[in-house]
Amino acid sequence: MWPTNAKARAWARSAAAEMHSGFGPLRNICPMSCGVRVALHQPVPSGLLQDLQRLQTLWTEGLQRFGGPFLAGEKFTAVDAFYCPIAFRVQTYALPLSDACQAYVDTLLALPSMQAWYQDALKEPWLEPVHDADVLAFGALVQDQRAAALKPPAPSPP
């Protein structure tokens, strides 16, 4: 679950703790929603930009220090699991990242478990209007791939 190398493990635990307790603007402005694509309103809130800068600093440190392609080295570990929801947010909101950080996101999104998670999310048979409103509070819907959104409306009773 955690890296076997002591330095990588210590760094990974610290990075996971930061994900657990931080990135409030990112979480609030870009709620998790796999099946939609959202264009953020401009200008992008400064808190989100600050979170993206910190995220990239953190990811770049791990990728460079431990050689990638995952944050603490060659193998997917718990720290990467903590950042998987962020990979989906990057995809949903087209968040701007450096090439190295985007490559890390692409690596996460290509994992079979992430692909399964994404496909399962698309198949959910319901919509959540309150959550959808949160998702669109800072942006405009560009695309909706969710099965529930693609269903034709039920016929009206006579």
Where are these regions (language model features)?
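Tryptophan-centric aromatic hotspots in well-structured domains and transmembrane helices
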Residues: W2, R27, L48, L52, ...
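GST-like domain detector, emphasizing the conserved glutathione-binding G-site
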Residues: M1-S46, T60, A148-P158
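All-alpha amphipathic helical-bundle segments outside canonical DNA-binding/catalytic cores
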Residues: M1-W11, F66-A78, A100
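Acidic/histidine-enriched, glycine/proline-rich intrinsically disordered or flexible terminal extensions
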Residues: A121-P158
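Short, mixed-charge aromatic SLiMs
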Residues: A39-L49, A103-Y118
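A contiguous binding-surface segment within folded domains or other stable secondary-structure elements
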Residues: Q42-R65, L71
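GST superfamily/GST-like fold recognition
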Residues: L71-P96, A100-Q102, D106-A110, Y118
